[in-house]
């Protein structure tokens, strides 16, 4: 993509309404535009990041055996009355009526709808286990939306729902999602720490929030420092095998949100030098809720003996749009964003330091074509902006690889390459940087 043809409305000043780094940088970098309190338009740069995050979430859900579908944003109020949650959910639910006076709501979550879909089609234990998920926009009318996408009213969420014949099967489904979430966040450059948490309006008696430690987070958390060093399961993990050892390794060390924190247990189990009390960002949460929805909504299947059995369920959410903000909170410096490669809007940016110069123009054009031919998602800054402005833009938007093409380096057959993550610089031939980035694209 040529920057001269890309829509990138960068702000020169820090927006006054932005209280935290991620909100400020997302607005400054032209990723978002606020349309109303807690409601944002995702502009091209931000939308590219959002789609990269969504794809990682999708790949890890598929790897764990979940099946993707798509449910509508609008739901019938009667479904929520059937489960008993319509009145209990409170003012966060956006309730509307259509022209025929039918009561609808803009879905804040989908337990009722997915249970209704399940009971309409699944009649036998032979069709179990089943895990269905979708990635869809949600709306919760937060009383005080703030911090940009970290606490918006409209947000993109991955929500999965498992159905099993009994509690043992449901806990196996829970464990699969537990492991899938560890891998999902690690691929984005984050350490999502599973912490015991309250179940809230979703219900049930088992839940873990996945927390990214950050001082700007809204959740108070307590954990054993050693949990930060636990290994992430590899891509070859066998989801059909016994995942219990992985779960035990991660849950044997103390980690809890402030809602369920046990101070006496924390002090008894964790040596003083390993106690961590800080804040964090919730990027996902998983629940086992048994028969909370299947019982009132009569989601039954015929068991092995022919008798009807009430299924056991769980739900598993990832804040897809929130993750964009969480990654920035974890990956930035004073100059701007430092995107991990897997979620970066572009993998590399070519900076023409003498726009209009015949040699630099020709070298940039050739480099641009060569990188595209290798499948590298590259941005070419072919604008008339001065070199200092190009450097500032590249740092602000956080492209992992910056390739600087200037007359001096070209005279030696080289370009200067800077990695945004650590600021390291290296002189390379154009062919070498194409080979390096092309090899990375092939590997991924």
Swiss-Prot record:
Matching Pfam families: HGTP_anticodon (PF03129), tRNA-synt_2b (PF00587)
Matching InterPro entries: aa-tRNA-synt_IIb, aa-tRNA-synth_II, aa-tRNA-synth_II/BPL/LPL, Anticodon-bd, Anticodon-bd_dom_sf, Pro-tRNA-ligase_IIa, Pro-tRNA-synth_IIa_bac-type, Pro-tRNA_synthetase
Keywords: Aminoacyl-tRNA synthetase, ATP-binding, Cytoplasm, Ligase, Nucleotide-binding, Protein biosynthesis
Localization of this protein: Cytoplasm
One GO CC term on file: cytosol
Gene Ontology MF annotations: ATP binding; proline-tRNA ligase activity
Gene3D superfamilies the UniProt entry points to: Anticodon-binding domain (3.40.50.800), Bira Bifunctional Protein, Domain 2 (3.30.930.10)
Family annotation (CDD domains): ProRS_anticodon_short, ProRS_core_prok
EC numbers for this chain: 6.1.1.15
Signal peptide start and end residues: none
Statement: the UniProt record of this protein carries the keyword Chloroplast: no
Reaction catalysis annotation: tRNA(Pro) + L-proline + ATP = L-prolyl-tRNA(Pro) + AMP + diphosphate
Protein's GO biological process: prolyl-tRNA aminoacylation
Top EC group: ligase
Family: Belongs to the class-II aminoacyl-tRNA synthetase family. ProS type 2 subfamily.
Subunit and interaction comment: Homodimer.
The protein's role, per its UniProt record: Catalyzes the attachment of proline to tRNA(Pro) in a two-step reaction: proline is first activated by ATP to form Pro-AMP and then transferred to the acceptor end of tRNA(Pro).
Protein name: Proline--tRNA ligase
């Amino acid at each position: 993509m040529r920057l001269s043809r890309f829509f990138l409305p960068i702000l020169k000043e820090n927006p006054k309404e932005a209280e935290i780094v991620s909100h400020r940088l997302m607005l400054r970098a032209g990723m978002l535009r606020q349309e109303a309190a807690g409601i944002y338009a995702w502009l091209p740069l931000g939308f590219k990041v959002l789609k990269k995050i969504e794809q990682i979430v999708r790949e890890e859900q598929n790897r764990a055996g979940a099946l993707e579908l798509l449910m509508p944003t609008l739901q019938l109020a009667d479904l929520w009355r059937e489960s008993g949650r319509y009145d209990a959910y409170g003012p966060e639910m956006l309730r509307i009526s259509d022209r025929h006076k039918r009561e609808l709501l803009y879905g804040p979550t989908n337990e009722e709808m997915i249970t209704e879909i399940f009971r309409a089609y699944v009649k036998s234990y032979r069709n179990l286990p089943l895990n269905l998920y979708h990635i869809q926009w949600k709306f919760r009318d937060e009383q005080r939306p703030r911090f940009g996408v970290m606490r918006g009213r409209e947000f993109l969420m991955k929500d999965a729902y498992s159905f099993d014949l009994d509690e043992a099967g449901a806990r196996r489904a829970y464990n699969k999602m537990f492991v899938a979430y560890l891998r999902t966040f690690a691929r984005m450059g984050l350490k999502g720490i599973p912490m015991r948490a309250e179940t809230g309006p979703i219900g049930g008696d088992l839940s873990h929030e996945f927390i990214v430690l950050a001082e700007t987070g809204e959740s108070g958390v307590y954990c054993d420092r050693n949990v930060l060093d636990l290994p992430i399961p590899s891509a070859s993990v066998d989801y059909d095998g016994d995942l219990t050892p992985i779960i035990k390794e991660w849950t044997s060390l103390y980690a809890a949100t402030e809602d369920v924190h046990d101070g006496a247990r924390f002090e008894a189990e964790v040596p003083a030098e390993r106690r961590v009390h800080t804040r964090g960002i919730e990027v996902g949460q998983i629940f086992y809720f048994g028969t909370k929805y299947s019982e009132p909504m009569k989601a039954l299947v015929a068991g092995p003996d022919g008798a009807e059995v009430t299924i056991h369920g769980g739900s598993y959410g990832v804040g897809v749009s929130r993750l964009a903000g969480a990654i920035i909170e974890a990956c930035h410096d004073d100059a701007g964003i430092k995107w991990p490669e897997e979620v970066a809007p572009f993998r590399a940016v070519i900076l023409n330091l003498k726009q209009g110069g015949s040699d630099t123009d020709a070298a940039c054009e050739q480099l641009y074509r060569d990188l595209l031919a290798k499948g590298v998602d590259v941005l070419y800054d072919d604008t008339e902006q001065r070199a200092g402005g190009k450097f500032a833009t590249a740092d602000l938007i956080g492209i992992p690889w910056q390739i600087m093409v200037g007359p001096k380096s070209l005279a030696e057959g080289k370009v200067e390459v800077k990695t945004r993550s650590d600021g390291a610089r290296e002189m390379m031939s154009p062919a070498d940087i194409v080979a390096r980035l092309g090899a990375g694209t092939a590997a991924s």
